[in-house]
Amino acid sequence: MVESVVKNWQGEQVGQKTFELRVAKETTAAHIVHRALVRQQTNARQGTASTKTRAEVRGGGRKPWRQKGTGRARAGSIRSPLWRGGGVIFGPKPRDFDLKMNRKERRLALRTALVSRIDDLILVEEFSNELSRPKTKDLVAAFTRWGAEPESKILLILSEFPENVYLSARNIENLKLIAADQLNVYDLLHADKIVVTTSALEKIQEVYNG
């Protein structure tokens, strides 16, 4: 059971909200979060790097000079890895870096990562109605009132993206918007401050507590 203060648009405390997210045991928490983080980063790799071996490089079928009598070192192909333009020894080949992780484990890692950041989590009321029109300056001022400095890395979690909020937020350099049902471990751990709306928190409990 976790309790967090709820702030309004002006940055004033207007109540408290209790929420419950099942997390990993203390002995295994770091391990499961680390596994989820490694999985996310490795799965983002393209794995398309490729080099040619001496068998794949064009040419080199003819022996460049006879074996003996020239005074030069013996050579069997101009595509030897020792030659410029030759094949590559043990170079990269296309491969699949994907790591498997059960959905239950992934969700457990997400919940554990989120709860571990409770000291940096700022819970706010819905504020889309406070922005009568898209205005980055107003949203930056709101973050400051909430205790999240605009220079810091901020993760803003919303249940949905109203156009005025999206347009106000997209030009803030260190801000990342994410939907409540699209969370990932890297963003939760990477942010300095995590700002969550009350409706987004309810959606997180609904989606990830299953």
Curated annotation (Swiss-Prot):
Gene Ontology MF term list: rRNA binding; structural constituent of ribosome
A GO cellular-component term linked to this record: ribonucleoprotein complex
Biased composition (Basic residues): 60-71
Keywords of the record: Ribonucleoprotein, Ribosomal protein, RNA-binding, rRNA-binding
Record has Nucleotide-binding as a keyword: no
Function: One of the primary rRNA binding proteins, this protein initially binds near the 5'-end of the 23S rRNA. It is important during the early stages of 50S assembly. It makes multiple contacts with different domains of the 23S rRNA in the assembled 50S subunit and ribosome. Forms part of the polypeptide exit tunnel.
Name assigned to this protein: Large ribosomal subunit protein uL4
